[in-house]
């Protein structure tokens, strides 16, 4: 846990600086009052599948190709490329205007949530030569911030897709590409972040936006971590050079939980928050765990978070204990759980169970419902040991394990959020 806070003089007339010592003695710094990550809890949802398409969240957009006997695009890049600019713009305008509306923000607030994370791709603000992407997302983002303000919901703006892709995931916009650090791609991402910082990082949105995430899920195992660290630093300083003390959110790049304890902690860095994403469904070993083992791992996440020097929270997690959701692993890639994951034979050697009816609540018996409730409650307790949590995702078209609305409706997600049927799992 973090201990006492004391005030020191600031060279900036706009804010005070508070060095906060960790258990290990390292200090990190706070300025301004966008959000008190030290004492207040974020309880939020991601607005996934809105400005960055994901086939598993809105499969109908992609099934339209399948229904016409065409190849199914694997990501937004290929979706827009297949349709062409005009038709892609028409379909995506319809999607942007209907997937998330004011009623969603009202329902989010009504569920006791206080926060949304809004993923958006670089292409919403700047296009590369020959990019097939279409634009128009920005006006919907601006409207979303107005709705958030109306319902007292705070927001992170999350750069979810970078030029060339930072991870090769379909949710970066471009699957199976790892070109983020090649050519001008990194600079384009920095230019986009500069635009986001200039527009959304200051006082105009200071009562709504409480963080700008520099980059979602950069895949540290395939990227040059030295260059990635340079990117984070440049993005941080570009925001600070606007005069803003807005919180800077840094995803952990899938490094170990303590990897940032000695980074971004000098007086040159303040209001830095580390974003961890926690799932247990993307390897056969994780999928084979019992519910007790899932709970144990979740509680370990929480315990580790208390030992970190920086404020940190879980910016993505779900109820999933299978990878059965259609296209969760990508278009055409099947599931490890039922041994249909043909993409990687090394991860497709063991049959764990059937995916039949896995997302249909009518097939869930009481024991299964209880197990999912236990796992959700354990994660909530774990993540609230520090700054909070952001569930992935607010809603989907068809899946259950990843859908906050459906899980809440069926009583599997606690309501109120602090109610517990299985208290003390992480004590």
From Swiss-Prot:
Instruction: Describe its function.
Output: Beta-glucanases participate in the metabolism of beta-glucan, the main structural component of the cell wall. It could also function biosynthetically as a transglycosylase.
User: Which species is listed as the source?
Assistant: Wickerhamomyces anomalus
Primary localisation category = secreted
Molecular-function GO terms, alphabetical: glucan exo-1,3-beta-glucosidase activity
Q: Name one Pfam family in it.
A: Cellulase
User: Which keywords does this chain's UniProt record carry?
Assistant: Cell wall biogenesis/degradation, Disulfide bond, Glycosidase, Hydrolase, Secreted, Signal, Zymogen
Record's family? Answer: Belongs to the glycosyl hydrolase 5 (cellulase A) family.
One of the GO BP terms on file:
glucan catabolic process
Enzyme active site: 217, 316
Catalytic reaction equation(s):
Successive hydrolysis of beta-D-glucose units from the non-reducing ends of (1->3)-beta-D-glucans, releasing alpha-glucose
Which cysteines pair up through disulfides? They are: 299-426, 324-355
Q: What is this protein called?
A: Glucan 1,3-beta-glucosidase 2
Q: Which GO terms describe its cellular component?
A: cell surface; extracellular region
Q: Where in the cell is it found?
A: Secreted
InterPro entries in the record: Glyco_hydro_5, Glyco_hydro_5_CS, Glycoside_hydrolase_SF, Glycosyl_hydrolase_5
User: Which positions make up the signal peptide?
Assistant: 1-17
């Amino acid at each position: 846990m973090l201990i006492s806070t004391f005030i020191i003089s600031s060279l900036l007339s706009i804010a005070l600086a508070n060095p906060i010592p960790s258990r290990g003695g390292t200090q990190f710094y706070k300025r301004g009052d966008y959000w008190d990550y030290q004492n207040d809890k974020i309880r939020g949802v991601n607005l996934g599948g809105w400005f960055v398409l994901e086939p598993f969240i809105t499969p109908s957009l992609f099934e339209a190709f399948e229904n016409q006997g065409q190849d199914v695009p694997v990501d937004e890049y290929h979706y827009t490329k297949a349709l062409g600019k005009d038709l892609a713009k028409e379909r995506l305008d319809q999607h942007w205007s209907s997937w998330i509306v004011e009623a969603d923000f009202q329902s989010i607030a009504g569920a006791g949530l206080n926060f949304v994370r809004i993923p958006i791709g670089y292409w919403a603000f700047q296009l590369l030569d020959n990019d097939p992407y279409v634009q128009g997302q920005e006006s919907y983002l601006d409207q979303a911030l107005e709705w958030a303000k109306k319902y007292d919901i705070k927001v992170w703006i999350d750069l979810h897709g970078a030029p060339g892709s930072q991870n090769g995931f379909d949710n970066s916009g471009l699957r199976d590409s790892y070109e983020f650090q090649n050519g001008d791609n990194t600079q384009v991402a920095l230019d986009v972040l500069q635009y986001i910082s200039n527009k959304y990082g200051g006082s105009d949105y200071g009562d709504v936006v409480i963080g700008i995430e520099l980059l979602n899920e950069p895949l540290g195992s395939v990227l040059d971590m030295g260059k990635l660290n340079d990117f984070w630093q440049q993005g941080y300083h570009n925001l600070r050079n606007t005069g803003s003390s807005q919180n800077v959110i840094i995803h952990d790049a899938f490094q170990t939980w303590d990897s940032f304890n000695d980074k971004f902690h000098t007086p040159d860095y303040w209001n830095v928050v580390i974003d961890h994403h926690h799932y247990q469904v993307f390897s056969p070993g994780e999928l084979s765990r019992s519910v007790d083992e899932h709970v144990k791992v979740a509680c370990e996440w929480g315990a580790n978070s208390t030992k970190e020097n920086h404020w940190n929270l879980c910016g993505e997690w779900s109820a999933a204990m299978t990878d059965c959701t259609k296209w969760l692993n990508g278009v055409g890639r099947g599931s490890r759980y039922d041994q249909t994951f043909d993409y990687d034979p090394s991860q497709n050697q063991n049959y764990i169970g059937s995916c039949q009816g896995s997302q249909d609540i009518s097939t869930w018996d009481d024991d299964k419902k209880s197990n999912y409730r236990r796992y959700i409650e354990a994660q909530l307790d774990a993540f609230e040991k520090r700054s909070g949590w952001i569930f992935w995702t607010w809603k989907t078209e068809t899946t259950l394990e990843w859908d906050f609305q459906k899980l809440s409706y069926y009583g599997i997600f606690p309501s109120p959020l602090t109610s517990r049927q299985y208290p003390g799992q992480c004590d």
